[in-house]
Amino acid sequence: GVNMMHKIFKYNGKTINSSDGTILCGIVNVTPDSFSDGGRWYSSEKAVAHALELIKQGAGMLDIGGESTRPGSTPVSAQEEIDRIVPVIRELKKCTDVPLSIDTWKAPVAKAAIEVGADIINDITGFVGDPDMARVVGKSRAGVILMFNPVIARPEHPGSKIFPSFGGEEVFSQEEIERMAALPIQESMCFYLRRCIKIAHEGGVDDERIMLDPGIGFGLTKRENLLLIKDLHVLRDMGYCAFVGVSRKRFIVNILENAGFNMNPETEDGHENRDIGSAALTAISTMLGADVIRVHTISHHRMPSEVGNAVRFSEAIADVHLKQYGS
C-alpha cells in the first residue's frame, strides 16, 4: 500500500531511511527515580557504561533522559536535567557514532544537549510544552521526535491526572481541547500532531528533520493504546518516519495478567514476562512500519524486530529454497 513508500529522517547531516528496517533505540535513564530500573543507572559513569552495553547488544540509537516522566514522578529543574545529561552526552560522543536522542521537552535542556553534540531531541509534548523549543531545534541541525501527548490533549481524562504537568496550556484553545476529547483517538492524534508540525515549521524545522510518535502509554485506555498501534500507518500516511515506545507498558502487563501470566516485577518470572510481552509488541510494531522502537532491554527485542522486518519487507526478499529439516 501507499504507506510502504520510503520515508527519510535527517539529523545532524545524517539520514535514517525507512527502507533500511527498524532501529532499536535503547533507553538510558540518568535519573535517580526512573520507573523501570529503580535508578540503577544514576550517575554518569553508570549511564555511560549502560549505554555502551546497549550498543554492544545492537542498539542503533540511544535515548538519554534526565527527568522521569512516569506517572507520579517529581519534576526536576532544567538546570538539574542539564547537569545529569551533559556529561553523559560528552562522554558518549567520544566513543560512539550511534545517534543520541535526548528525552526532554525543555528548551534550555535541548540547547545545552545540542551544544555538546546531541543528534535528536525527543520531545514528549511535541513542541507544545515549551514555546522556545521549536526555535532552539530550528537553529540547529538536530532532528526531532514529536510525540502525541494525550495528557495535554485531554487534561480532563482521569489517566491524565496522575502525570506531572508538561506545560502547553496556551497552545490549544478550550474548544480545541474539547474537540480532541470528543474525537476517536486516532483523529485526536492527527489533529494534535498537525499542530506540532506547524509549530516546528514556524520554528525553522523542516519535514525531513521530523519523526512522529503516537504516544503509546501516556494516560490512555487499553483500547486506545491498541488502536494507536494498529493504526501506526497513519503516521507514515502523513509522510513521516514513526517512533514507538513499546517497553514495559502497563496495558501490555494488564493484557497478559488477564490471560493468567505472572507479571509481578518483584519476581524473576514476572520481570522477564514484562520484557517478553514488550517484545511481542516490537514484532507487531516493526511489521506495521515503525522506523525506531524505544526499549529498555535490547536483547529481548532483537529477534522480534528481525522477524517483523522480514514480514514487512517480504516483497523485497529473494526466494530462498530452504533445505529439508534434518537433512
Which residues does each predicted region cover?
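Glycine-rich, proline-tolerant flexible connector loops at the mouths of alpha/beta enzymes
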Residues: S34-S36, G60-P87, G215-K222
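N-terminal amphipathic alpha-helix/helix-capping segment at the start of soluble metabolic enzymes
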Residues: V2-N29, K198-V205, N254, N258, ...
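N-terminal small/glycine-rich loop or linker at the start of catalytic domains
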Residues: K14-R40, G72, I89-R90, M147-A181, ...
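Alpha/beta enzyme core
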Residues: S43-I64, C95, P99, A107-I120, ...
